[in-house]
Amino acid sequence: SCLVGSEMCIRDSLNTAYDSSGISNLGNEAVTLSDTTLAVSVLNTLDGNTSGTVNANTVTTLTGSASDLITAYASGGISNLGNEAVSVSSGNASTSQANTLAAATSGVVTATLSDGDLSTLAGLTETGNAYSITITDTSVDAAALNTLDGKTTVAINASNITTLTGAAADLNTAYAANGSSITGLGNEAATLSDTTLAVSVLNTLDGNTSGAIDASNITTLIGAAADLNTAYASGGITGLANEAVTLSDTTLAVSVLNTLDGNTSGTIDAGTVTTLTGS
């Protein structure tokens, strides 16, 4: 049943009229809709009932399956679509389908994506849409995760990730988004690609994950001696011990310097130090 005069009643009445065996000589009429929110399956049925153009100018929201929505946008018999919000309310959408829908309307596309691997999801072409995404990869490049984070307004479920790889700064960016636009991070192992790194960035990363950080690619660490010793003392960072070190201190306790000297077999550049204190 429907409320007489309501949009649902008008819409249903159009298709009912076409289906009626008691009404003849319909089939080539132009149709002007009054709906604002419309199930796309109903629109496609109406499009099939008449060879005339269906004017969907009043529609502000289309709902339904991704395939049905794409069918409506591809139809030459439906006019004035292109700025409505789209909700994939039946089933999921593939990355390819999401791109097709996003290109078809300037409105926000809301959908749960069926793809979970970063290599496929990297193919998303637009931003500002409400895609629900669950990453299925266990090892993920942090820069790729951050790029994906910028393509959806819905928090990305990253709970399947067990290893993050890449530059420490990119990993810290991902962790900074955790709890807001990314969820499920906090205990991943990390494999760094940096060769030269500010130790403050490394220590921040160490605080962001309870997983082990593989820093074996690092050949030079830069920063304050105390911060460097903190990194070397951490049980959460592996692969350090032979890095060159460039200090940023100007005044330094010699005991701290000697501890640092014992932490790495690499050369310590103390060129910034103007004052040494201690016995």
PLM features: residue spans?
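Extracellular beta-strand scaffolds
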Residues: 38-39, 53, 93-94, 107-108, ...
